């Protein structure tokens, strides 16, 4: 139970969850774009970002786009056309079709399915990595055997059980779209995330492991797909002497100015990952003895990028906490705490934490969408049926988990104070 009388000293400057870390070369590349007047969506910076993405991630083709969401959208369009054929103008490539997707993720993973008229089917999470559960995915194919597309995200920079998941996807003749927006630089059995799917995405949003303030990249080994994305992202203009359009296009290309920032960030990817890992290890050591554990990882097979350090409170150490759609309340209890209390305590010293992603099947906009757990339809179970166990894994992690300040500019002294605040919540 956190007491206001603890009087922890506030940080003069806010300690952020994860903010951009600049090094110097970024501004030089931005100046280069300005001084050469390459300020639009073509230029050397863009070319270099695409080259560096292929080099660092290990794919054959990269297309720099305005956001990771843009890449996911065009990935869904590609996958939909491959699976179901070209739609008529005004109709999405996934119209009326189900798409399996990660449940515990940010909505940017899921929304592109809906952009193309598809119906997301949410697959429950597993406790080992907090990612899509292969057993639940297999069950989903039993229930909806005609589904041809699966979207998988790697939560907070930790690779999921991608080999097992991919084997299931291939067995059922489906297409994997990989969302590596949070996991750039992470590897599974030595292979970079962002290369396991046929169509893949990384993000350069302001809070990511490297950033351009915005932006993302479409990654693939399929040259034809890369060319199609490049065309669609520039309004699908045909190679004619006039403005001619035979397909629906989008204004999704990355600015050469933004690309200058991304270009300057790429050489620091490994350094940023090392800093994030040190933060994770300091939390892990500092929180020993508390009834909490850090976000889990399969270190035998994968190397995360440690983007965000998270914790989950032991069930018996949870005080009473009730969340509505936008409000929350909890009851302080000696020796116990909850995510809300810890987040409030962290905020009181001018540091930023956040709740775990609220699972998509719990979101009001998607509350009527199918949700699959290990034993079948997660929407169809009665209270009596679930009385003896967890309602679903994602809901449980959301209830007990939170993201800790993970900024790679945070000092050891600042982190030690945050750890002391967390300890005080369990007094």
PLM regions and their residue ranges:
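Short beta->alpha connector loops at strand-helix junctions that form conserved
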Residues: 103, 121-126
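N-terminal "arm"/small-domain region of PLP-dependent enzymes with the aminotransferase-like
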Residues: 1-39, 405
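Active-site phosphate-binding strand-loop segment of PLP-dependent enzymes
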Residues: 128-212, 217-219, 224, 407
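Conserved coil-to-alpha-helix start sites within the AMP-binding
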Residues: 104-110
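PLP-dependent aminotransferase class I/II
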Residues: 47-52, 56-62, 135, 139, ...
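Structured binding elements
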Residues: 117
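Phosphate-binding glycine-rich loop
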Residues: 42-98, 112-114, 122-124, 191
């Amino acid at each position: 139970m956190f007491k206001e009388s603890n009087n922890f000293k506030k940080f003069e400057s806010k300690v952020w969850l994860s903010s951009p870390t600049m090094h110097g070369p970024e501004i030089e590349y931005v100046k280069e774009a300005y001084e050469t007047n390459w300020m639009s969506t073509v230029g050397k910076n863009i070319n270099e970002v695409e080259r560096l993405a292929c080099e660092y991630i290990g794919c054959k083709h990269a297309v720099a786009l305005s956001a990771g969401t843009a890449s996911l959208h065009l990935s869904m369009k590609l996958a939909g056309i491959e699976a179901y054929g070209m739609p008529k103008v005004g109709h999405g490539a996934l119209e009326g079709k189900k798409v399996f997707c990660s449940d515990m993720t940010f909505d940017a993973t899921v929304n592109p399915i809906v952009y193309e008229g598809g119906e997301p089917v949410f697959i429950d999470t597993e406790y080992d990595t907090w990612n899509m559960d292969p057993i639940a995915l297999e069950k989903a194919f039993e229930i909806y055997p005609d589904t041809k597309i699966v979207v998988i995200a790697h939560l907070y920079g930790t690779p999921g059980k991608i080999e097992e998941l991919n084997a299931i996807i291939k067995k059922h003749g489906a297409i994997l779209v990989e969302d590596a927006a949070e996991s750039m630089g992470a590897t599974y059995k030595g292979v970079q995330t962002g290369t396991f799917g046929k169509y893949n995405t990384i993000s350069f949003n302001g809070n990511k492991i490297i950033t351009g303030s915005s932006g993302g990249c479409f990654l693939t080994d399929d040259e034809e797909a890369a060319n199609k994305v490049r065309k669609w992202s520039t309004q699908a203009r045909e190679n004619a002497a006039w403005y001619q359009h035979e397909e629906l296009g989008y204004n999704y290309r990355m600015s050469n100015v933004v690309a200058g920032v991304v270009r300057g960030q790429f050489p620091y990817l490994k350094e940023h990952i090392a800093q994030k890992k040190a933060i994770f290890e300091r939390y892990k050591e500092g929180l020993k003895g508390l009834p909490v554990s850090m976000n889990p990882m399969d270190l035998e097979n994968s190397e995360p990028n440690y983007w965000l350090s998270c914790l989950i409170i032991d069930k018996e150490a949870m005080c009473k906490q009730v969340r509505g759609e936008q409000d929350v309340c909890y009851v302080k209890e000696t020796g116990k705490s909850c995510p809300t209390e810890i987040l409030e305590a962290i905020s009181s010293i001018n540091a930023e934490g956040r709740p775990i992603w609220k699972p998509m099947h719990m979101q009001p906009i998607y509350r009527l969408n199918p949700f699959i757990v290990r034993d079948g339809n997660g929407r169809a179970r009665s209270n009596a049926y679930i009385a003896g166990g967890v309602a679903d894994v994602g809901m449980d992690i959301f209830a007990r988990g939170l993201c800790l300040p993970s900024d790679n500019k945070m000092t050891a002294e600042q982190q030690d104070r945050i750890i002391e605040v967390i300890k005080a919540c369990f007094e």
